[in-house]
Amino acid sequence: MTCRIEEYTEAGQSPFAHWFNRLDPVTAASIDRYIRRMESGNFSNAKPVGQGVHELRMDFGPGFRVYFGMDGQTLVILLGGGDKRRQDAEIAAAIARWQRYKKAKV
């Protein structure tokens, strides 16, 4: 199964890109590899965190996380990113974004 990866946007801005673009190039490349694994259907490092939002956990650094929702079986919506230190706040923000995404689809 292959998945399509898209970024959630608010007013033309991507919260995921805002976070990702501030990372150093080596870290960004490593995180991109994890995202590409999801694109090829490998969700082994992902777990649900509530209300339809999932967390992609990285096995390096300060516990990097990428938050996403699944729109159907093959569309992944990137909602944001962060690390273990701000995990609770990032999860809450991702859940709010996911709810706005679903509401806008209706």
Question: What does each model-found stretch correspond to?
Answer:
Residues 65-69:
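Short beta-strand motif preference
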Residues 1-62, 72-76, 83-106:
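Basic, Lys/Arg-enriched alpha-helical interface segments
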